[in-house]
UniProtKB/Swiss-Prot annotation:
Keyword Magnesium part of the UniProt annotation: no
Organism expressing this protein natively: Paenarthrobacter aurescens (strain TC1)
Classification via PANTHER family: 10 KDA HEAT SHOCK PROTEIN, CO-CHAPERONIN GROES
Protein name per UniProt: Co-chaperonin GroES
Gene: groES
One GO CC annotation: cytoplasm
Assembly, per entry: Heptamer of 7 subunits arranged in a ring. Interacts with the chaperonin GroEL.
Superkingdom as given in the UniProt entry: Bacteria
Physiological role: Together with the chaperonin GroEL, plays an essential role in assisting protein folding. The GroEL-GroES system forms a nano-cage that allows encapsulation of the non-native substrate proteins and provides a physical environment optimized to promote and accelerate protein folding. GroES binds to the apical surface of the GroEL ring, thereby capping the opening of the GroEL channel.
Family listed: Belongs to the GroES chaperonin family.
């Protein structure tokens, strides 16, 4: 998937994954009652930030990784009819290993 957003420094562009629409017992959860997703697929990464010595520190995730991120982190962006979240690398809590 090609994204028209090029993140800077240690920023990451994530496509949020859809939240479950039903409960385990089969009840449908309306959009107004659903929590924001905290899991998404990385679609673009920045080159990394510079440390105090001027060395570039690479980002720990790669394009295609599924990550769990901070609930209130990032900035929501819409482009090309799709919704994305631009996060700082510090807002990523974990990589989901399947």
């Amino acid at each position: 998937m090609s994204v028209s957003i090029k993140p800077l420094e240690d920023r990451i562009v994530v496509r949020p994954l859809e939240a479950e629409q039903t409960t385990a017992s089969g009840l449908v959860i309306p959009d107004s009652a659903q929590e924001k997703p905290q899991e998404g697929e990385v679609v673009a990464i920045g080159p990394g930030r510079f440390d105090d010595n001027g060395n570039r520190v690479p980002v720990d995730v790669a394009v295609g990784d599924v990550v769990i991120y901070s609930k209130y982190g990032g900035t929501e962006v819409k482009t090309g009819g799709n919704e994305y979240l631009v996060l700082s690398a510090r807002d990523v809590l974990a990589i989901v290993v399947k």
